[in-house]
């Protein structure tokens, strides 16, 4: 019985890994296709469409705004969660954030202030977490397309190589716990964007943004396996 149970448990694990690998391969190809297209519209519809195109046939809810509230235990927060948008307010919040950004003028900003503003906007859109899964990958693709409209020659390599840091930086930009002296900060996502846009060499290490050492179990891990590319080769975590 133990051998049989062990066999089927192993088979289940293998099947899950194969499914996740298949998902990553499919999403990777779709990302490349979307980024190769010289098209873009700055709107919530574009953002939602990117999600649909990335995950159609993978998630039943591809391109659909979630209708339930969510929490996600985060390794970088010692198992705590970011407060995501309520399901009832997602579309209105998306519309508001996009309208605010559309009406914002970068004309008189120096590049440093522009990067800070972009970091805040992208962090805000991600915090809404419009979908059940796939929010970070959707946000990454949208960000690349958006930054290209400013004339920046943005590739997907940095997002691929630092995919886990990118997500953790977005988490830190949206988490406050004043009782523990933790404040939301965009400094980490700004460091990522400065490397991306200005070719700086800021060190992007997950341990640098960990709120404190954690032994909490069942939270998203920052192990080497999670450092692999969310956009291309690693579908876990599925955001």
Per-region residue spans from a language model:
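Phosphate/pyrophosphate-binding active-site loops
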Residues: 1-38, 76-228
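Conserved small/polar residues in nucleotide/adenosyl-binding loops
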Residues: 232-239
């Amino acid at each position: 019985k133990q051998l049989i149970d062990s066999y089927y448990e192993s088979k289940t694990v293998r099947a899950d890994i194969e499914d996740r690998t298949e998902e990553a391969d499919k999403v990777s190809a779709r990302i490349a296709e979307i980024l190769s297209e010289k098209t873009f519209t700055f709107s919530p519809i574009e953002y939602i469409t990117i999600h649909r195109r990335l995950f159609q046939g993978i998630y039943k809810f591809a391109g659909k705004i979630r209708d339930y509230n969510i929490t996600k235990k985060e390794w970088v927060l010692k198992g705590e969660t970011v407060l995501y948008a309520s399901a009832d307010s997602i579309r209105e919040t998306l519309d508001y954030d996009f309208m605010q950004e559309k009406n914002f003028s970068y004309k008189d900003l120096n590049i440093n202030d522009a990067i800070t503003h972009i970091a805040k906007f992208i962090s805000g859109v991600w915090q809404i977490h419009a979908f059940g899964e796939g929010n970070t990958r959707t946000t990454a693709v949208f960000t690349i397309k958006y930054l290209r409209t400013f004339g920046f020659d943005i590739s997907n390599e940095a997002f691929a190589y630092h995919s886990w840091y990118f997500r953790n930086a977005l988490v830190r930009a949206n988490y406050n716990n004043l009782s523990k002296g933790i404040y939301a900060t965009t400094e980490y996502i700004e460091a990522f964007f400065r490397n991306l846009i200005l070719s700086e060499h800021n060190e992007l290490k997950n341990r640098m943004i960990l709120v404190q050492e954690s032994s909490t179990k069942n939270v998203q891990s920052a192990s080497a396996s999670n450092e692999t590319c969310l956009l291309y080769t690693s579908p876990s975590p599925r955001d």
